[in-house]
Amino acid sequence: MTNTASTLRTAVPLDELIAAARELRIGGRWERATRLLDSGEATDPRSRALLALAAAEVALESDWFGGTALAEPRLAAAGLFVEVLLASLDGKPADEAQSDIRWDLDFLRLRHGYLGQVRVDGVFRVGPDGRDPDAPAALRTHAERLRGEAPDGVRRGWAEMYLGLVADNLFAERDVAPGHYEAALCAGEAGEAGGTGEAGGSHNSGDDLLVREALRHLGDHDHDHGDHARARERWSRATELGARAGTVPGTLSQQVLLAVLTRDAGDEAGAVAMVREIARWAGAIGAMTTEAQARGFLAGVDPTAPPAPAESDS
């Protein structure tokens, strides 16, 4: 008897395919999400652009959590497909959906640029010292432009979120960042539905992820100011929202912050036991950056330590 392999092809609505890949991406199943998207066949420029954008976002999150280097070629490919889409309009004005696609691509480029600044040779590096000042300034300008061009409130909220991250982690402007996080929080809680990408897809989980991210960083500022009760409130809610949205690696990284509060309260044994499990779980799913953060905590590193301000030349 000879076994023969056959490939079964079936038609699936594009929105459902991308939504399924999005759930896999958020859950940390980046390879499976990529294979699913790459298996899709599309014949029109818009569908090809949407598939390429979704694949680029999977690659970007794999780079962030898994320490891979996959996003750059995926972003380049997505850029080409978006160019083809815009060229296909042949002078006709772009509709709202196509404007959303262009914004989403630009936002992925912002996120990739930010990652390149805070992750250097595999190490998370914050603060302005030893950094070309033009690069953070360009990211800030990029995020400001995205905020101004955002087609809806959730996307505007994500631009605000990255303005806060750039201020916090690249410029060490700790007094500036919270205002951006508060604006992001308001946008996420308002619940305007976005399109594709981090700000869109499933209405609830898209909003949940933005609210989670804002609460995560606002809680960090609460912690720095010694308001541990407020930090716990925000971090606990962020953990809950992340779990509801299905972000497995993000929820693990959030639990590390809760362990910081356990350590602050004097329960070192409890904090260590908690983070030891987080490190094990993160390693099991390939979330290498979260595992490294957890192992740093076990070695005594404070993951909430603020970046140092720029040293004066005087």
Predicted regions and their residues:
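Helix-turn-helix repeat elements of alpha-solenoid scaffolds
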Residues: 22-38, 63-91, 126-143, 170-182, ...
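Short coil/turn linkers that connect adjacent helices within long alpha-helical scaffolds
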Residues: 7, 41-46, 96, 147-152, ...
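Structural motif corresponding to the intra-repeat A-B loop/turn of tetratricopeptide repeats
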Residues: 27, 62, 116, 170-171, ...
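Alpha-helical adaptor scaffolds
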Residues: 159-179, 183-191, 204-250
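Residue register of alpha-helical TPR repeats
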Residues: 15, 50-57, 104, 109-111, ...
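C-terminal non-catalytic interaction modules
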Residues: 1-21, 25-28, 255, 260-314
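Structural register within alpha-helical repeat arrays
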Residues: 20, 55, 59-62, 109, ...
